[in-house]
Amino acid sequence: MDRIALMNAPGTDWSAWPAPAKLNLFLQITGRRADGYHLLQTVFRLLDWGDTIHLRVRSDGQILRIGESLPGVAEDDDLVIRAARLLQSAAGAAAGAEIRVDKRIPAGGGFGGGSSDAATVLVALNALWGLALTADTLAELGLQLGADVPVFVRGRNAWAEGVGEQLTPIALPEAAYLLVDPGVHVPTPVLFRSQELTRDAAPAKITDFASGSLLDNAFEPVLRRREPAVEAVFQALSRVGTPRLTGSGSGCFVEFATRAAAEQALAQLPGSLRAWVVEGAAHSPLLDARDAMKV
């Protein structure tokens, strides 16, 4: 994805905003809260690739979806519509918006597409509607939409705990990633019910991650046994590096020091695989777009 800031097409009042994908560089489950939500630890890595959200402000207060970003998802269930309505209600905003999504991030792959799209709508409409809500407030609203939304609102690579909302910014080295979408989706609640899932990992520290001792994803063994397509991707990627799972899957990735190395690895994969080479971002391009509105 180009690192676009705010981009206005000539002769229109539409604006385009980036919604970057993410990777979980590791993920472990350390317990469960009294309300049933699982506690986890992970590192979120933002990428320079993702969706684009197109927005046009309306004066009549209506929130409308233009096109169908996710086939089969009703407008009222679409996270971008829910995000806009939530912000409108929380801020008492009179304005509305038309929303169109250019999807690149595979749905249900653990790359954060839905959460990132929702975060971009919150951040962008906060600017376009002139609301001036703080990042803390937007992150709190985002948490009502999903545990991953706050990290996209804040726009920084982060060590995450709790249900994923307790974020500590973390500096990560430059890296390129070979991503593969196996094309299968298992709902996260189904995976959480699996008897094979490790739910009591010993809590780790950021220093453990920095030492390179944390690479595993708790969902990986469950998915590899359950889904032949995921196992096949792991086998293919193991020929070019150390494959890992992102989120609760089914997206897989291998990290490389350079884009050239990742491109070379991509050339060795079967042409039938849906794969991309992307780079890690030091911060979200959404922050650049937001800051451009202040100039």
Curated annotation (Swiss-Prot):
- Keywords, comma-separated and alphabetical: ATP-binding, Isoprene biosynthesis, Kinase, Nucleotide-binding, Transferase
* Reaction catalysis annotation: 4-CDP-2-C-methyl-D-erythritol + ATP = 4-CDP-2-C-methyl-D-erythritol 2-phosphate + ADP + H(+)
Tell me its EC number(s), please.
2.7.1.148
Please name the pathway.
Isoprenoid biosynthesis; isopentenyl diphosphate biosynthesis via DXP pathway; isopentenyl diphosphate from 1-deoxy-D-xylulose 5-phosphate: step 3/6
Q: Which GO terms describe its molecular function?
A: 4-(cytidine 5'-diphospho)-2-C-methyl-D-erythritol kinase activity; ATP binding
- Out of the domains of life, which is the source? Bacteria
How would you classify this enzyme at the top EC level?
transferase
For the ligand (ATP), the binding residues are 106-116
InterPro entries from the UniProt entry: GHMP_kinase_C_dom, GHMP_kinase_C_sf, GHMP_kinase_N_dom, IspE, Ribosomal_Su5_D2-typ_SF, Ribsml_uS5_D2-typ_fold_subgr
GO annotation, biological process = isopentenyl diphosphate biosynthetic process, methylerythritol 4-phosphate pathway; terpenoid biosynthetic process
A Pfam match: GHMP_kinases_C
Active site: residue positions: 22, 148
Similarity comment: Belongs to the GHMP kinase family. IspE subfamily.
**What is this protein's function per UniProt?**
Catalyzes the phosphorylation of the position 2 hydroxy group of 4-diphosphocytidyl-2C-methyl-D-erythritol.
Official protein name in the record: 4-diphosphocytidyl-2-C-methyl-D-erythritol kinase
Gene responsible for this protein: ispE
